[in-house]
């Protein structure tokens, strides 16, 4: 892995972002199960050194000021973690509200492992997203750290390199100070069982390119076509055919997102459309013919507006 134990322990922010594959087991390197378990509360705090921040799009000038809140992460933030095999499961996977005026953390399921030469240290990585407060844009990142027995933990390296936001795009990277607290997690069993049930309930997932082999005559290249969405603004895409999820991947500005199945996506107008449709179906079920009724017949004040 590009991020070596010594670099994580030193916690010095580089001048440019890492590649996303630095946050997961190195390709071609025989990784093993983590030498130590990790159960308890991870507390993250902003470090004393400047973090990396690079703006690509800022339509409304959110980052114009050097001290703008959008330039810093929420601090402190904590998440209770449960381990199931090599899976590292946050007890809370919904937005974590706090006092930060711009960002809320959303954590996904990560993993633990160990690589040759790590010695007593084990590695952990967690996908996360930063959700804009009172908005729906999501900025996707990954964090990683090493840990050892007796609660020892390195600074946490983090990086954000993609988003679902048209008006604000930025790379964020650096280190957070970390503390691991040995707290009891009464809901650990339930969290693990819920995660296992979620995995069991997922559709089979295959690369989008395999669609052409499974369904001759289909054209995978038509999905996520550059004529429809600019490639560098694409978060993910795919199609479901015969109960199989064909995924186009999760590209970022720093390489493929290493936890594609954990990518948190906003609903935007999908939620409003689904809500309205479900509401109308319920209304029609209770009052057959309701979908063909005119509102003006029940609200005379609407007559003047047709």
Predicted regions, residues:
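Active-site SXXK
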Residues: 266-289
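Extracellular/lumenal ectodomains of secretory-pathway glycoproteins
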Residues: 13, 17-40, 46-52, 56, ...
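Long, charge-dense tracts
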Residues: 65, 69-220
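Short, flexible loop/turn elements at secondary-structure junctions
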Residues: 241-243, 269, 299
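A short, well-structured edge-of-sheet supersecondary motif
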Residues: 144-146, 216-259
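Active-site helix/loop module of the DD-peptidase/beta-lactamase fold
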Residues: 1-40, 286-306
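Second-shell loop/turn segments in exported
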Residues: 261-268, 302-305
């Amino acid at each position: 892995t590009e991020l070596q134990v010594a670099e994580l322990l030193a916690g010095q922010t580089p001048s440019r972002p890492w590649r996303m594959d630095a946050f997961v087991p190195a390709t071609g390197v025989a990784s093993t199960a983590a030498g130590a378990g990790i159960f308890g509360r991870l507390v993250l705090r902003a470090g004393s050194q400047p973090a990396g921040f690079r703006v690509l799009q800022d339509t409304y000038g959110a980052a114009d000021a050097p001290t703008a809140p959008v330039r810093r992460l929420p601090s402190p933030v904590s998440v209770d973690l449960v381990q199931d095999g090599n899976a590292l499961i946050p007890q809370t996977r919904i937005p974590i509200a706090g006092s930060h005026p711009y960002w809320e953390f959303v954590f996904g399921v990560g993993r633990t492992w160990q690589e040759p030469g790590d010695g007593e240290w084990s590695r952990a990585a967690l996908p996360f997203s930063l959700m804009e407060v009172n908005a729906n844009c999501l900025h996707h990142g990954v964090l990683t750290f090493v840990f050892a027995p007796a609660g020892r933990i390195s600074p946490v390296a983090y990086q954000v390199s993609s988003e679902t936001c048209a008006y604000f795009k930025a790379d964020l990277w650096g280190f957070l100070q970390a503390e691991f607290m040995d707290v009891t997690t009464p809901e650990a069993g339930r969290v693990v069982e819920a995660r296992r049930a979620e995995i069991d309930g997922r559709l089979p997932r295959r690369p989008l390119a395999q669609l052409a082999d499974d369904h001759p005559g289909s054209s995978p290249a038509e999905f996520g076509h550059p004529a429809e969405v600019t490639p560098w603004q694409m978060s993910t895409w795919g199609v479901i055919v015969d109960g199989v999820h064909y995924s186009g991947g999760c590209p970022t500005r720093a390489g493929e997102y290493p936890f594609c199945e954990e990518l948190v996506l906003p609903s935007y107008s999908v939620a409003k459309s689904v809500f309205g449709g479900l509401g109308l179906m319920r209304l029609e079920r209770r009052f057959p013919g309701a979908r063909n009724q005119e509102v003006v017949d029940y609200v005379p004040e609407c007559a003047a507006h047709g």
